[in-house]
């Protein structure tokens, strides 16, 4: 399931625009995330086309979701949220995530969109998955070089309230001893782990070096974990940071959203998506 910009003239002019693939948090869905991102999308819709992917697994919504969106189910997740959730193999999780992403992209192509896929934008569990997708892309580029050019090449990711560790999403090597870089976890692991894996002291293999923008609410109970994702899993010269006075949610006030918008435009310019401010 993908959630689209409304049909009509408003939809038509976005068909050629660079596309941002949006990944919702655990226990919500694409429709809810579209509503949560409504202000951000309004500021950026003249330059970028937002496409919302739906996670593959049924999930229980949190109280913060049901208080506002209780009538907007079914609720979905990308990963197991807790150890109480049904067990699934890492291979199954990776396969279903890849299928959800591919379906969202294919559906948008079938609606006539032609813009390059240039970025990922995720919130909470969706941010973890977005960072992990970017890490998988980085790994593929390192291994295949120019042969990886036929795959979608995301230039950067916007990570809102994302926590580590990164998840190993390469299906051909997602199981077996020694197949996962130290510091990462396989896709069968619950995403709300109380503890994170030990990080290597003599290697930076676990580090994401492609550009990321981190958006942190300063009143978010998980702020320390979000900062750990930035500091421990993302190379320092590739990160940008926006902090705002908010809880665990997507910014809605104009002053907070414009700070995020400014950094997205800056990343788009720096990565060659835009030659100048649009």
Curated annotation (Swiss-Prot):
Pfam families: FSH1. The active site is at 124 (charge relay system), 220 (charge relay system), 248 (charge relay system). GO terms for molecular function: hydrolase activity. Disruption phenotype: Reduces the amounts of DHMDA produced. Induction: Deletion of the conserved eukaryotic csnE deneddylase subunit of the COP9 signalosome leading to defect in protein degradation results in the activation of the silenced dba gene cluster. Expression is positively regulated by the dba cluster specific transcription factor dbaA. Expression is also controlled by the transcription factor flbB. The keyword Hydrolase applies. Transmembrane segments: none annotated. Coiled coil: none annotated. One of its GO terms (cellular component) is cytoplasm. The keyword Hydrolase applies. Esterase; part of the gene cluster that mediates the biosynthesis of the antibiotic 2,4-dihydroxy-3-methyl-6-(2-oxopropyl)benzaldehyde (DHMBA) and its derivatives. The direct non-reducing polyketide synthase dbaI product is 2,4-dihydroxy-3-methyl-6-(2-oxopropyl)benzaldehyde (DHMBA), produced by condensation of one acetyl-CoA starter unit with 4 malonyl-CoA units and one methylation step. The FAD-dependent monooxygenase dbaH is responsible for the synthesis of yellow pigments derived from the oxidation of DHMBA. The roles of dbaB, C, E and F have still to be determined. This is Esterase dbaE. It comes from Emericella nidulans (strain FGSC A4 / ATCC 38163 / CBS 112.46 / NRRL 194 / M139).
């Amino acid at each position: 399931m993908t959630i689209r910009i409304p049909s009509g003239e408003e939809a038509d002019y976005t068909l050629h625009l660079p596309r941002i693939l949006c990944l919702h948090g655990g226990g919500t869905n694409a429709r809810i995330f579209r509503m949560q991102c409504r202000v951000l999308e309004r500021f950026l819709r003249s330059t970028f086309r937002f496409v919302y992917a739906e996670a593959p697994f049924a999930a229980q919504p949190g109280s913060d979701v049901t208080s506002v969106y209780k009538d907007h189910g079914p609720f979905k997740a990308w990963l197991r949220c807790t150890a109480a959730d049904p067990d699934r193999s890492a291979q199954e999780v990776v396969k279903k995530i890849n299928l959800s992403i591919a379906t969202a992209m294919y559906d948008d192509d079938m609606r006539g969109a032609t813009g390059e896929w240039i970025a990922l934008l995720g919130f909470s569990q969706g941010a973890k998955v977005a960072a992990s997708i970017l890490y998988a892309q980085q790994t593929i580029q390192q291994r295949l070089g120019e042969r990886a050019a036929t795959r979608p090449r995301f230039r950067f990711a916007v990570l809102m309230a994302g926590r580590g560790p990164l998840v190993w999403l390469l299906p051909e090597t997602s199981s077996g001893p020694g197949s996962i870089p130290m510091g990462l976890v396989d896709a069968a692991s619950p995403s709300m782990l109380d503890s994170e894996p030990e990080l290597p002291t003599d290697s930076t293999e676990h580090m994401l070096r492609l550009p990321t923008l981190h958006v942190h609410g300063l009143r978010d109970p998980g702020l320390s974990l979000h900062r750990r994702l930035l500091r421990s899993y993302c190379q320092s010269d590739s990160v940008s940071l926006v902090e705002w006075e908010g809880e665990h949610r997507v910014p809605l006030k104009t002053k907070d959203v414009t700070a995020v918008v400014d950094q997205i435009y800056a990343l788009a310019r720096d990565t060659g998506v835009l030659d100048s401010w649009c």
